Amino acid sequence: SAFNPHEKQLIGDLWHKVDVAHCGGEALSRMLIVYPWKRRYFENFGDISNAQAIIHNEKVQAHGKKVLASFGEAVKHLDSIRAHFANLSKLHCEKFHVDPENFKLLGDIIIIVLAAHYPKDFGLECHAAYQKLVRQVAAALAAEYH
């Protein structure tokens, strides 16, 4: 396994506390606000023209929840992340034509959101374990692109 028992424990302990809807919505909102050129993938979501519109956009919030719930599946499948994301990778590559760099960016934003919401839990070791996790998820999602 890429994760040792201690890392698995750290990842699981924090994940049980995560409010997936709230943190997921915030993570996707942050990506669209901080990297406005990424909005082109979400033009069918209605008004995403500025920070307030994005934060209050129900489709952005719902998709953010969906994205973070999917990330939560990686937490449950730490030993088979690549296999678990094979179909999503194919979908994002072939149907949505998403730049795989986005997966790394969103992973880093997920780290920021978790650190902001759970500062007592998000110590150095937890940060290292989650950084490893977001890297593996990003690599798994980019797998179909190679």
Swiss-Prot record:
InterPro entries: Globin, Globin-like_sf, Globin/Proto, Hemoglobin_b, Hemoglobin_oxygen_transport. The keyword Transport applies. Heme b binds at residues 63, 92. GO terms for biological process: hydrogen peroxide catabolic process. GO terms for cellular component: blood microparticle; haptoglobin-hemoglobin complex; hemoglobin complex. CDD domains: Hb-beta-like. GO terms for molecular function: haptoglobin binding; heme binding; metal ion binding; organic acid binding; oxygen binding; oxygen carrier activity; peroxidase activity. Keywords: Heme, Iron, Metal-binding, Oxygen transport, Transport. Red blood cells. Residues 2-146 form the Globin domain. The keyword Translocase does not apply. Involved in oxygen transport from the lung to the various peripheral tissues. Has antimicrobial activity against B.subtilis ATCC 6633. Has antioxidant activity. Heterotetramer of two alpha chains and two beta chains. Belongs to the globin family. This is Hemoglobin subunit beta. It comes from Crocodylus siamensis. The lineage of its organism: Eukaryota, Metazoa, Chordata, Craniata, Vertebrata.
